[in-house]
């Protein structure tokens, strides 16, 4: 039988580790965000098979994004996030009313748990105005 093919996961950092690998390692492989369920080991918790991605092949999150209007949209991304371009693309494709907020000095995973960086004030202002 053929062996399963898994997405590459970083279990330890090396001199060749990319900035994205370092950022995700810092969250998912440290007490900051690592979770190992009973019966598993840390080395087996983040190994989705490549076939796990098939469900995304028929999903395009920007399809018909303009039809959300006239409901307001707030896109938030870290200014240093590798994923920032996705928020910028969504913002560009969305109809008004819309807003793009870049969090200064924040990367992608910083907005998971770094409460000093999460823009709670911006969220409150947006929801107070948008949920009238």
Task: Report residues per predicted region.
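Short beta-strand/loop motif that positions the catalytic acidic residue
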Residues: 74-77
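Catalytic histidine neighborhood in serine/cysteine hydrolases
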Residues: 95-109
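Active-site nucleophile elbow and catalytic-triad environment of alpha/beta-hydrolase enzymes
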Residues: 48-65
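Conserved loop-alpha-helix segment in the C-terminal half of the alpha/beta-hydrolase fold
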Residues: 80-98
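Extended, charge-rich helix/loop segments that form flexible
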Residues: 10-41
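Short, conserved loop/helix-junction motifs that constitute active-site signature segments
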Residues: 66-69, 93-95
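Short, small-residue-biased leader/transition segments that mark boundaries at the very start
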Residues: 2-6
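Catalytic active-site module of serine/aspartate enzymes centered on a nucleophile-bearing elbow/loop
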Residues: 106-109, 113-132
